[in-house]
């Protein structure tokens, strides 16, 4: 379904995956495998199809989160290509971009950008932002708890932190009937199998499809996945009060992980 969403037919999808799996079983260095698999995907047009799908992904997420944004300054932490931030800015919010590397599209947005250092404190003063977005970010952090503390520090009292996370150990009961039907293969898996699916797609999407020769541009993949309940417990411990959780399910065809949206209020 991932390749189908990119316009790749079933026969070619099978061939591409067979080649990638062949490399996966016979590599001496993980970086060599990632590059070899990336080259296969690039030769078959998979990589070139991604940018258009990222526009669709930004539009999907924008619809999911826009009603939760408060008026004022928004920090898009882990902004990626900043396409979502552009949509938020068009709504009238002032947006600050931040990420560990600068995507080529960032400069085209005209929005302010701050280059982050992996594992370092967020380089903004206390109580600066009305909204802080961390959209599929926490599971890429080596220390999600410290990142939560920093997120709370830079967000105003009463401000809002909006999180989307890839989760596991879900049964889909919160989804509509149509959404459950689309997700039935994933939902039939055990919790550990769901976690492993997340690991596979997280690595495949971030380190194979988006492979880079530059070590500083390789996405960090420590696979810090949690269940929705475990995320809530961690948020509570940092006085990030969960006002609402929305089960989005496998809502993004190019990244078919089960997502939940967490709307948090900053208590200080």
Predicted feature locations:
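Conserved class I S-adenosyl-L-methionine
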Residues: 71-80
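Class I SAM-dependent methyltransferase SAM/SAH-binding core
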Residues: 79-121
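A short glycine-rich, Lys/Arg-flanked "PGG" loop and its adjoining helix->strand segment in the class I
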Residues: 145-157
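Short catalytic micro-motifs in class I SAM-dependent methyltransferases
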Residues: 136-137, 165
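Class I SAM-dependent methyltransferase Rossmann-like catalytic core
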Residues: 34-57
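Conserved alpha-helix/loop element of class I SAM-dependent methyltransferases that forms part
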Residues: 51-71
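A conserved beta-strand element that flanks and buttresses the S-adenosyl-L-methionine
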Residues: 133
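C-terminal alpha-helical "lid/dimerization" subdomain adjacent to the S-adenosyl-L-methionine
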Residues: 164-238, 244-251
